[in-house]
């Protein structure tokens, strides 16, 4: 059995073009979410750090300048990035995001205890992902955030295994995109230090990003919840399904130690055994699954038993 760890810090990401718009967002971010990431790379004017610090009150505040190469909009120099992030810290921001590719091991000269060192691979999980994780951990940053586009189930499982092997309170790994949804739901169960969600509907800052309030309510991120088994929605596209919210609310109301997660697959017959084996190895056995398009007919063919009503 595992328990969704209370120590995972849930972070709501906010991306707006002006300081006033960011301050407006601060008033409507779910009050239960303890931390906010301010995406400075989306600002079209100079950041007013003292005003932003005041607007977000006592929440843990993370300043991020995501580069274009890693999925953001910032195109300035390394020196400009260092100056802006240092100014954020001086104004009372608690943490800053520093991309490893930009900073190397030096973290732009910023204090490691207030840095989230990050790497984002938009193409997929790199072949040397273990070595990359090691370099990031060696930087001395307070937190390590390794993110990659999950091109399919195999990538998602690699990221979950990576997270499971580094559950010491500093490390976070998850995937972007449809296949990455599984990792966003499960990485906190495997010891992720951080979990990122969109602050508001329609304002995701990365592909496949869930709402921060859904991470809290649906997947129990940031609050303890025992999990003895997983149940899953299996389909080609699963991001818009209400099934996780409905099932997890029922599990919690009934006091059942289970979690229902979305899993994007290409082939039910080929990938379901892989999924079951990988989850069992992680200590999260798959107790059952429901299926959606395009696997409904295939599910009847691979099932161990089929009731007579199937197909009617």
Regions found by a protein language model. Give the residues of each.
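Active-site beta->alpha loop and helix N-cap motifs at the rims of alpha/beta catalytic domains
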Residues: 5-127
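A short, charged/proline- and glycine-enriched loop
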Residues: 5-8, 226-230
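Short catalytic-loop micro-motif centered on adjacent basic/acidic residues
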Residues: 11-12, 36-39, 95-98, 144-148, ...
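Short beta-strand segments
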Residues: 12-15, 39, 64, 118, ...
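Short beta->alpha junction loops
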Residues: 13-18, 120-122, 147-150, 262-270
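Non-catalytic positions within long, well-ordered alpha-helices that form the structural scaffold/packing
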Residues: 29, 89, 137, 188, ...
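Catalytic alpha/beta core domains of metabolic enzymes, predominantly
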Residues: 101-229
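Phosphate/diphosphate ligand-binding glycine-rich loop within oxidoreductases
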Residues: 228-312
């Amino acid at each position: 059995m595992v328990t969704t760890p209370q120590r995972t810090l849930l972070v709501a990401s906010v991306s707006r073009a002006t300081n006033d718009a960011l301050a407006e967002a601060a008033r409507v971010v779910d009050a239960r979410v303890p931390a906010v990431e301010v995406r400075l790379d989306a600002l079209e004017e100079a950041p007013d750090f003292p005003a932003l610090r005041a607007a977000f009150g006592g929440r843990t505040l993370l300043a991020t300048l995501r580069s274009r190469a890693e999925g953001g909009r910032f195109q300035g120099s390394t020196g400009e990035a260092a100056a802006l992030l240092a100014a954020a810290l001086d104004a009372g921001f608690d943490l800053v995001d520093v991309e490893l590719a930009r900073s190397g091991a030096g973290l732009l000269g910023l204090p490691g205890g207030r840095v989230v060192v990050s790497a984002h691979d938009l193409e997929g999980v790199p072949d040397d992902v273990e070595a990359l994780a090691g370099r990031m951990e060696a930087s001395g940053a307070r937190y390590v955030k390794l993110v990659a586009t999950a091109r399919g189930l195999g990538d998602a499982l690699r990221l979950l295994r990576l997270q499971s092997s580094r559950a010491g309170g500093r490390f976070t790994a998850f995937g972007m995109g449809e296949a990455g949804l599984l990792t966003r739901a499960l990485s906190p169960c495997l010891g992720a230090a951080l979990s990122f969600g969109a602050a508001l509907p329609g304002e995701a800052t990365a592909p496949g990003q869930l709402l921060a309030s859904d991470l809290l309510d649906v997947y129990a991120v940031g609050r303890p919840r025992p999990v003895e088994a997983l149940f899953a929605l299996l389909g080609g596209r699963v991001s818009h399904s209400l099934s996780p919210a409905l099932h997890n609310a029922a599990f919690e109301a009934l006091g059942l130690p289970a979690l229902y997660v979305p899993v994007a697959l290409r082939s039910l017959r080929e990938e379901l055994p892989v999924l079951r084996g990988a989850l069992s190895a992680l200590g999260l056995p798959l107790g059952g699954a429901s299926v959606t398009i395009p696997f409904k007919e295939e599910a009847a063919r691979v099932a161990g038993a089929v009731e007579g009503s199937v197909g009617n």
